[in-house]
């Protein structure tokens, strides 16, 4: 029998991830790059992460639908690693359609993705309130409790919406347990089972056209030569395994999560693009070695409009931390960097960069992987001259201010990764490619 020739993986998939604590500006980059890809995939997280896209004088925040939806040639996929709030999803679909963009036929939802239910949101809020000083700083969107049910093998998946009997049985089983928690542990009220069954049976009629086996779909598309961009939510330092545990999210924003959350094998990944701000921010609690508590930190927040796209919470601001970023580069296998919000630094006479820490009086260069140690480090800051002018008109690297170029080159040399994309303003075209 004649043997078939081996076909090598295309390596036509790219992973785009945040290298910091989230809010790095991934939405702008995905929106820009979606012209170059056939499919954009969201692979983890839920409606706890907001991606802001600016175009045609509009500013739009998406939480679940991939940012590529505003490129009419692009197909968008919500992968199996995402936890989906059906109410939030339908609101987003309506928002996108109201802007004149077709969604049906361009958005596919994994049948294996888990659902966020009303009881998950209530548990999230009650559990966070009970933590007192040890609060994680969750968004209260039910993300953590939904992932808890997923890994406890009690979760309700998108595919369950298609079978009324299975849905009813799972809802009743889950609510029996959750109502006991509400009444005995939290001294609250029960959720009515029958009203929730009726509500979620209605979702089937609306969401059914979008549901598909996205693992099979994506692998078929790759075999046929399509290109795929995998879009992460949050940032590497919030990864449940590799982040500042326990002050982390409940999923894996790192590059490994792109494979498990989409069903695309690692040998299809050709590039891993790491997105980083020219400074750093963090929402919620947890160690933040370069955090600024003075007027400089306030100024970064004011100029950078640092308020959460999902919660509206004020973000904590600090200088860029290359110790943390070296760790993110290693954990993710980052092949190139995208630098965002460089324009926020336009008005600073001096900029600081953290290249090492001190711990108990000793200089260290490696990122501590336990939160207790990380909370005790002090940043060693290197001052750099600011450029005190806008780079918004620059469209290539040579047109940028000399001090701004020196800043970019310093980051490249220290991280040993090329910076190929520089955002010099909020607008879609205020971008420098190298």
Swiss-Prot record:
What residues bind Mg(2+), as annotated? Answer: 23, 50
Biological pathway: Purine metabolism; AMP biosynthesis via de novo pathway; AMP from IMP: step 1/2
Where along the chain is the active site annotated?
23 (proton acceptor), 51 (proton donor)
- Biological process, per Gene Ontology: 'de novo' AMP biosynthetic process; IMP metabolic process
The residues listed in the UniProt record as binding IMP, with positions renumbered to this chain, are: 23-26, 48-51, 139, 153, 234, 249, 313
> Where do the annotations place substrate binding?
309-315
Top-level class of the enzyme under EC nomenclature: ligase
Q: What is its EC number?
A: 6.3.4.4
Q: What does this protein do?
A: Plays an important role in the de novo pathway of purine nucleotide biosynthesis. Catalyzes the first committed step in the biosynthesis of AMP from IMP.
Family, as annotated: Belongs to the adenylosuccinate synthetase family.
Protein known as: Adenylosuccinate synthetase
Q: Which organism is it from?
A: Chlorobium phaeovibrioides (strain DSM 265 / 1930)
